Amino acid sequence: MEEGGRDKAPLQPQQPPATSPGSGDEKPSGKERRDAGDKDKEQELSEEDKQLQDELEMLVERLGEKDTSLYRPALEELRRQIRSSTTSMTSVPKPLKFLRPHYGKLKEIYENMAPGENKRFAADIISVLAMTMSGERECLKYRLVGSQEELASWGHEYVRHLAGEVAKEWQELDDAEKTQREPLLTLVKEIVPYNMAHNAEHEACDLLMEIEQVDMLEKDIDENAYAKVCLYLTSCVNYVPEPENSALLRCALGVFRKFSRFPEALRLALMLNDMELVEDIFTSCKDVVVQKQMAFMLGRHGVFLELSEDVEEYEDLTEIMSNVQLNSNFLALARELDIMEPKVPDDIYKTHLENNRFGGSGSQVDSARMNLASSFVNGFVNAAFGQDKLLTDDGNKWLYKNKDHGMLSAAASLGMILLWDVDGGLTQIDKYLYSSEDYIKSGALLACGIVNSGVRNECDPALALLSDYVLHNSNTMRLGSIFGLGLAYAGSNREDVLTLLLPVMGDSKSSMEVAGVTALACGMIAVGSCNGDVTSTILQTIMEKSETELKDTYARWLPLGLGLNHLGKGEAIEAILAALEVVSEPFRSFANTLVDVCAYAGSGNVLKVQQLLHICSEHFDSKEKEEDKDKKEKKDKDKKEAPADMGAHQGVAVLGIALIAMGEEIGAEMALRTFGHLLRYGEPTLRRAVPLALALISVSNPRLNILDTLSKFSHDADPEVSYNSIFAMGMVGSGTNNARLAAMLRQLAQYHAKDPNNLFMVRLAQGLTHLGKGTLTLCPYHSDRQLMSQVAVAGLLTVLVSFLDVRNIILGKSHYVLYGLVAAMQPRMLVTFDEELRPLPVSVRVGQAVDVVGQAGKPKTITGFQTHTTPVLLAHGERAELATEEFLPVTPILEGFVILRKNPNYDL
């Protein structure tokens, strides 16, 4: 019997008929029309349909008669008819179609029935019928007064319809009306398990999100569905406002813990940025192998937990979290890929490819400037490889080819080459600490900090070496040591380091630059922790400075330090914004905007982006009016204003849009379009910031449309736009060895051969493109682009905010700020270990990641894959999965360091 109700004639003769004329319709006005229609319809109906229609009409009439003993069998028959027809998915089931015109009559009959079982039974049937009528949630109304028999018997479509009505009804009830919500809740408790059991997990989640009862999920979830449910919940996070987004994450986290999926739970705890929870998850896991995997994840995210000594395998876990092995694992990858051979800058510039051989004439324009560029390029390209051809053999020769501040950056680049190699690196840097030149000494101090970036060491070598120079008489020495400490302890929130640095800001000998760098360093160390001491000290420093001092370009680093301290903290910044109200313009709006955008970094908060767009547009009108008055006067005024005005807050607003939107794909796409408009119509300060924003939204992800835009603006009439565009090209392609970008940059190098500043930028971009010979990334997102590393964002922001005044900072004397990028450098590799942490080469498939949220079954998660043997490199947007069933990964996301276990069910 369970058939029929297909598009054409149903198989069983009895099926629900269209109405006969005169079947008490609610609206008599439409009745005549319908009668005519029915006449036509009756002609078309097949025998079986006709029979079905008559039968249903008879049943309805029977319900209208006085004889109550006939009600029960009539209702039974109606129900059987409706149920037996719900098998078809493509069309409205015939019985429902034929009963529609009787809907009003059935309701009347229901009202006149005596209370009791029959009345409830009738309510059930009307409830199902209501699904086809667009009424005022009558499906729900009659369901609640019906016989409460199980939902499943009426089919999936009915359950879906009901769920929609429950959600709407819930939103109309106030919190006060608790009693009315009770029956709805009981319904929900039926709907959710039904959906879970029928592959409609996301519908269950949607319903619970609508009625804000997500916590109910945990009870109804089973082994098969939890992965899908959690994937759906976490992918909804970007689209719901505070505080619901954290509620969703906490719910998914609870589900993972229920099934002892610790690595997944840990990842969500890191997304929530809740350190107590992280520690709780880590310590509650009793499986040492899983703990090691979680330690790798924490190390990658830059989180260090103080474990008690009695934890099993304490030393191993501490070592993994401290990233002690990062350098040796990275070098193992380099040997595997056969790229250990050091490169010199000329290998990158490929000067031999330039046709008119003006490598000579170009480099004579500003030889110190070119040598400085080569120092950076050499550092970027050989980063973390531990050897190069300029500095590690006989560095002095190279250092003295640089002048003054150039020596500082050149010496510091040694730190980049020895990145993460604390034991071996410091001995090589040591000899420069005794140099007679302050600049070289300061650079060596910075190098010590860089080497320790992202790596913990119980001996704290960076603190020991650098602490003596923090209040040194020479401001040059202060710069190197303070910025070095900032990089070495970024994200650690170490009180001892902060107490050492904070007094420097108020010290009378500190120049504005030193005060700025100190604020920066403190912001990096306390990143995202809302550290009270850091906040109060920086605020106090800002208050104490005079208006002219705040016009100094280095003053921009003070609010940046504040912003980094509150990175991603959302509303926690209200008090600071209030405190900044007393500062004079233009510094106030600059600081306010900067702190504000940092607080929402990576959140994808649409409302914030709208506010920032207002900031970008508001300024424009007022200037336009002036322009009409007197263009000439405006030009002169602009020239005078430019250095004093801090590139105002508009530049920051543009960067902020990128900073907020980079967290999720759709927001980033929309931001891209906006940037296009800003580049065409914006003020000069705005246009200078747009290339930097493009760089931030697509770090280490060389998308052609972005590269083309940047390439176009690298020839802009405004030199600062072109400097920033060229550098942005380097950021977008950082660590990718992208051939198309490399070719673009070589052409630019020829085009700008006579312009030392632009050429300097081209060289930097070339160095970044080949960062770590193509093995490193600057992208702050990891774990399938779910987690944002705050330390990495801090490093990127430091550099980009400094580029807002590229002429005075980067092309001036403070190019050492570029080493902020070190905080974001991470190997983009996948290395697999066995349970004893020995390298274990296995074959993996690497391909473009596919979004599988809310899809049924087990869809493929990657497309267009190639099979490699680990260790392998993963490009932006790629995902890996094991190509063998012999091993099972301990964590579902294959990225960074992954521990594999033997599959017990694997038979050889």
UniProtKB/Swiss-Prot annotation:
Highest taxon of source: Eukaryota
Keywords of this entry: Acetylation, Phosphoprotein, Proteasome, Repeat
Gene3D superfamilies assigned to the protein according to its UniProt record, in alphabetical order: Leucine-rich Repeat Variant
Modified residues (Phosphoserine): 29, 147, 361, 363
Ranges of biased composition (kind: Basic and acidic residues): 24-52, 623-643
Subunit structure: Component of the 19S proteasome regulatory particle complex. The 26S proteasome consists of a 20S core particle (CP) and two 19S regulatory subunits (RP). The regulatory particle is made of a lid composed of 9 subunits, a base containing 6 ATPases and few additional components including PSMD2. Interacts with RPGRIP1L. Interacts with CRY1 in a KDM8-dependent manner.
Name used for this protein in its record: 26S proteasome non-ATPase regulatory subunit 2
Taxonomic lineage from the root: Eukaryota, Metazoa, Chordata, Craniata, Vertebrata
